[in-house]
Amino acid sequence: MNRRQIEQSVTEELASADDRLVAAYLFGSVARGTDSSNSDIDVGILLRTAPSGELNDLRFELDGHLERALGRRTQVVILNNAPPDLLHRVLRDGRLLVERDRAARIRFEVRARNEYFDLLPILKRYRRREAARA
């Protein structure tokens, strides 16, 4: 499957997903076009607020559903509680596939970008220290 086919399949599979799904992004090597036959398919999902256990149950459910439908390993990540650096990579390199609530998606993206840029000076200092140790 090429990227376009994967995008279409993921979009179709998530079209009937749980009502709590707000948005979904394809990210990682498939979205960048650098995947190989061994690469998994990374899908980030933004969900309406729900208890943590319910979110994980839904993640496992969607992960299994996508793996069966695509015939390839998938990794579904709940974006609601993902770290800022991962959210930055999803928004920078990812492709929005599903959007059920535009306003909620935009609020999420603005918040995620603000958190990342607030954290960026700390990340840069940390990376410089790690590079100096190597």
Annotate the PLM regions.
Residues 42-45:
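Short, aliphatic-rich beta-strand segments
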Residues 1-23, 31-37, 48-134:
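Catalytic core of pol beta-like nucleotidyltransferases
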